[in-house]
Swiss-Prot record:
PROSITE patterns: CLPX_ZB (PS51902). One of its GO terms (biological process) is cell division. One of its GO terms (molecular function) is ATP hydrolysis activity. Zn(2+) binds at C15, C18, C37, C40. It comes from Acidithiobacillus ferrooxidans (strain ATCC 23270 / DSM 14882 / CIP 104768 / NCIMB 8455). One of its GO terms (cellular component) is HslUV protease complex. PANTHER family: ATP-DEPENDENT CLP PROTEASE ATP-BINDING SUBUNIT CLPX-LIKE, MITOCHONDRIAL, ATP-DEPENDENT CLP PROTEASE ATP-BINDING SUBUNIT CLPX-LIKE, MITOCHONDRIAL-RELATED. HAMAP family: ClpX. This is ATP-dependent Clp protease ATP-binding subunit ClpX.
Amino acid sequence: MAGKHEGSGEKTLYCSFCGKSQHEVRKLIAGPSVFICDECIELCNDIVKDEILDDHSEAQDKLPKPMEIRKTLDDYVIGQDVAKKVLSVAVYNHYKRLEHGGKDNEVELDKSNILLIGPTGSGKTLLAQTLARLLNVPFAMADATTLTEAGYVGEDVENIIQKLLQKCDYDVEKAQTGIVYIDEIDKITRKSENPSITRDVSGEGVQQALLKLIEGTVASVPPQGGRKHPQQEFLQVDTRHILFICGGAFAGLEKSVSARLEKGGMGFNAPLKRRDKEATAAMLMQNLEPEDLVRYGLIPEFVGRLPILALLEELDEEALISILTDPKNALVKQYQKLFALEGVTLEFRTEALRAIAKKALARKTGARGLRSILEQILLDTMYELPSMSGVKKVVVDAAVVESGTKPLLVYDDAAKVDMSHPA
């Protein structure tokens, strides 16, 4: 019963769940012909919180092993075998550290943040995204080039944590076990080895600000994405257990390694000049030292907080062809599905795939440029196809990619073929 009249004629309201009157509780909230008191709300919150903690505990129990992590990465990312192995071990150790961090007071495990070095389009971002999806943890991505020191026009480094909170509906506990990927980290290197009077608001200063987040601090974040002001209550997010993955191309870094090895009399300089890019990348993995990154422009403290290094190789033609067709979410499969929704089969001939890969290599965009090439060659067909009838297959060959001719259209009537395409 929601309420009844007392002697004064005033109607007394009761909680529909526990039966307490409005005089026995601090607050009674009304809904459509139903009431709930603050005590019942608190009880409901406790029940939901316990269920969330149980789910989190269950997820931790199912932490995939390094070989299982690697297998999942293989499903979505082509090549980069060494980087996958490094990432699989680092991520596994990080979440095992979270799981057992408070159970043994004798040895404290340091956080293993990761630095990915590789050219544009080599798979750095995709690797980080795939790891977060596999582990079912919040994932946020930031571009280091947009970050500035606090007080300057630009994006505050603490906005990164705000993005992470947004991905998990401002669940602080969940956000504190998430993964943050910071791209273009090489673009915030110190502009010169000697500090100058001019303020470097997007270089060393940003490294100093990021350093606090990466090594572990309690960040104050405005709730629900609001702007900061003095009277506002902030959400407190502990970043000690957030895994930070930083990525960058670090163009020219091999010159620093080469100069150091030559200076040390190790005789690596001449072979380095003769080797192709793949061999150079392999040599870097074996010989890159923290001092090379410091000489490049990262401050020593920042390098020290990124102890795990994974080097990604530049993708060759064969790797780009595999990226087009092999992964679970391969681009060719995605476009074939789009065409299938129109009841049409999309076919790419082998020479067309090779031509697409060559065009991406020429643009020096790696795998990142593949989608724009596909969109360009299929745009007119995707525009016209919904208004056409009788088409059962679209065939893309090398001429479509290289010369810009239209794809071959095959109709239900086998004799009727689009004659605008050369035989």
